[in-house]
Regions:
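Amphipathic alpha-helical hairpins
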Residues: 1-165
Length: 165
């Protein structure tokens, strides 16, 4: 599809974020399995639920524009997921607390991709005829910000302190 209109860019970016969220969902499930801190495990479980809600929302929006949700593959998130594997899942840690600190780091990197994506999509949708899309996407953006803030709270609370002990 030629990206010659804002609508075409909007659909392209919806599909890109749909792909990104699907990839980050699988990575977040694996991070949850690797985590040891109970607050972190809870936050990652909540993250899985939130990402799934985002995927569901994106799918509905994309289909409402007569487009295929799987129309794009997000190479940016593919790279971030590779980083999750390299720095957490396939890495050797002598300390669970240090692993938990790295889990937060990698999760927040994926989350920040989502923040950028949802933020752009909200801006694209704030035009005539897309108010419903904008509201749904704003909810996803707000939820993503909430998850990011929770990870920062956990990191600056017990996890980073335990990792430095």
């Amino acid at each position: 599809m030629a990206l010659s209109t804002l609508t075409a860019v909007y659909i392209d970016q919806l599909q890109d974020l749909y792909s990104a969220d699907k990839q980050s969902l699988e990575a977040t499930r694996k991070l949850h399995e690797a985590a040891t801190d109970s607050d972190l495990k809870t936050a990652l479980s909540n993250g899985v639920e939130g990402i799934q809600k985002g995927i569901d929302t994106l799918e509905v929006i994309i289909k409402s524009h007569d487009a295929d949700p799987d129309g794009e593959f997000c190479k940016g998130m593919e790279g971030l997921v590779k980083e999750v594997h390299a720095h957490v899942l396939d890495a050797d840690f002598g300390d669970d607390d240090v692993r938990d600190a790295m889990i937060i780091t990698q999760y927040q990197r994926m989350t920040h991709y989502g923040l950028a994506g949802y933020g752009c999509l909200v801006a694209f949708a704030k035009r005539p005829g897309l108010a419903d899309d904008a509201n749904k996407l704003q909810t996803c953006l707000d939820n993503t910000y909430g998850g990011d803030r929770e990870m920062t709270r956990i990191a600056t609370g017990d996890v980073n302190k335990a990792a430095t002990a």
